[in-house]
A protein has these predicted regions:
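Surface-exposed loop/turn motifs in large extracellular/passenger domains
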Residues: 1-77, 83-110, 116-141, 147-168, ...
Length: 528
């Protein structure tokens, strides 16, 4: 077949490869010297034939089954497909499958659901790739797709139930677009990555990252572009010890990964350092992103990506323990709209915006339940370009309409309904500036309400005290000034009302409504 023509060396059947016992595949000297045979690398396992460059049917078979077991050692890579040949492309059936099962053993290289330089199925033959790891060790990474190039014309399912992966797990393939003859890797339909099985005693360990997308290629379509695919990328963690979880792809300075459809990340349990809804280093998913936390222990959760942008992000905290939640991205990237909803669980600090860099357009934060210490409508040290919208229906320690360390915001909106809160600030915390703040208090128990920020300036503040019991109300900020403050006392029960700021900060004009007197005295305080 290596010198044949299209259709030569085709197997109409299903190869079954079992490697167990103490078997060792590959001579390390040949591997280190990059020795090849008819273009195939030494020490690797291929689920079908080698094939020939430029011919997808040579070396093909209908399906592919590979099982790695016992104390077997694979000194290089495992491919569900061939070197050049594509699984199922010559099948008389309109479907094909690839099953890779790792029960135990040691794989020095990586595992690919597709082939080295080709994929599985065709535009008229739907392929399904299943990779299941129950134990053993993979020193490289696990890819649902192909290596250098190739399209999986169907769905990829990656299930890591146990064992240890030294590097990362990808729902898609590795290779990215280089030129027209090297277009990279594609998975046309859905991606389903599941880490851990709560019914089993095994706990998988992923020492680097889990990606729903590819390293550098495309998922949810057989071509890349700006359209939104109906296919989805789903990542579910039921248990496991993982450094990073990404709903999207990886990327680098050379390659941009594409996720063409919507992304869904669901954490049901596990110990995870960072959860990202989007991409890692490059690229923006075409669809929307949903991250749902039901349980587990997580250090940081981001609706967006690491150094990347996103369209609309949705983060739901239903349970578990999370140190910080960001509706936006981490280091950089623009997020159009972020939505964060807390219905349960525990979170120390919840942000509507980005963390260290980039911007968010509109942020929407809703706290209905859970143990939340501090809420920011904005980000940690980032700006919001349109508005922040914070609604509190539960007990919270401190609420800021704006950002923390820095960042500028044109409008912040806070609505508090029947909640118990220590401090409410319309503005930022330690830096940056908010132009206009709006606070509406509707039935609550609050110690302090500040129209402005804490050590952060505000232009205009608007505080509406409709209902509730409040100890102190300041039209301005805390150690921070404002140009104009507007306080409407409404029907709330208030002990002290100050038109200006607390401790320090200049306020040029104050307006307090629904008092028996009218004042413009910046230092005025009223006891009701």
């Amino acid at each position: 077949g290596s010198t044949g023509n299209e259709g030569d060396g085709t197997l109409n059947g299903t190869p079954y490869i079992y490697i167990g016992g103490t078997a060792t595949i590959g001579d390390k000297n040949l591997i280190s010297n990059n020795t090849t045979l008819f273009g195939a690398e030494s020490g690797s396992v291929f689920g079908i034939g080698n094939g020939r460059s430029g011919y997808s049917t040579i070396g093909s078979s209908d399906n592919s089954i590979i099982i790695i077991d016992d104390k077997a050692t694979i000194n290089n890579n495992v491919y569900g497909g061939g070197n050049y040949g594509a699984t199922g492309v010559s099948s008389s059936s309109n479907t094909s499958y690839t099953n890779i099962i790792i029960n135990d053993g040691f794989i020095e290289g990586s595992v690919y659901g597709g082939g080295n330089k080709n994929g599985s199925g065709s535009s008229s033959k739907t392929a399904t790739v299943n990779i299941t790891m129950n134990g053993g060790n993979v020193v490289g990474s696990i890819y649902g797709g192909s290596n250098e190039k190739g399209t999986i014309y169907g769905t990829v399912n990656v299930n890591i139930n146990g064992g240890e992966v030294t590097n990362s797990v990808y729902g898609g393939g590795r290779g990215g677009y280089t030129n027209s003859s090297n277009s990279g890797t594609f998975v046309r339909d859905d991606i389903n990555v599941v880490i851990g099985d709560s019914s089993l005693n095994t706990t998988p360990i992923i020492n680097k990252s889990v990606y729903g997308g590819s390293a550098y290629g495309t998922v949810n379509d057989s071509s890349s572009g700006n359209n939104v695919s109906s296919s989805k990328t789903k990542v579910t963690v039921n248990k496991g010890i993982i450094v990073n979880v990404f709903g999207g792809g990886e990327g680098n300075n050379t390659y941009t990964p594409y996720v063409m459809g919507d992304i869904e990340v669901t954490i049901n349990n596990g110990t995870i350092t960072n959860v990202f809804g989007g991409n890692d280093l490059k690229g923006k998913p075409n669809g929307n992103i949903t991250v749902t936390i039901n349980d587990g222990t997580i250090t940081n959760t981001y609706g967006g990506g690491n150094e990347t942008s996103a369209n609309t992000t949705n983060v739901y905290l239903n349970g578990g323990t999370v140190d910080k939640i960001f509706g936006g991205s981490n280091i950089s990237g623009t997020v159009t709209t972020s939505n964060v909803t807390a219905s349960g669980g525990t979170c120390t600090t919840l942000y509507g915006g980005n963390n260290a860099g980039g911007t968010t357009g509109v942020t929407n934060v809703l706290v209905d339940n859970g143990n939340i210490t501090t809420v920011y409508g904005g980000g940690e040290a980032t700006s919001v370009t349109e508005s922040t919208n914070v609604t509190i229906n539960n007990k919270v320690g401190t609420v800021f309409g704006g950002s923390n360390l820095s960042g500028n915001i044109p409008i912040t909106n806070i609505v508090v309904n029947d909640a118990n809160i220590n401090d409410v600030y319309g503005g930022n915390n330690q830096g940056g500036k908010v132009e206009n703040t709006n606070i509406d208090i509707n039935g609550t128990l609050i110690t302090n309400v500040y129209g402005g920020g804490l050590k952060a300036e505000t232009t205009t503040t608007n505080v509406n005290l409709n209902y509730g019991l409040i100890t102190n109300v300041y039209g301005g900020g805390n150690e921070a000034g404002a140009i104009t403050t507007n306080v409407n006392l409404g029907g709330a029960n208030i002990i002290n009302v100050f038109g200006g700021s607390n401790t320090s900060g200049e306020v040029k004009t104050t307006n307090i409504k629904n008092l028996s007197v009218t004042t413009s005295d910046l230092s005025s305080a009223f006891t009701i």
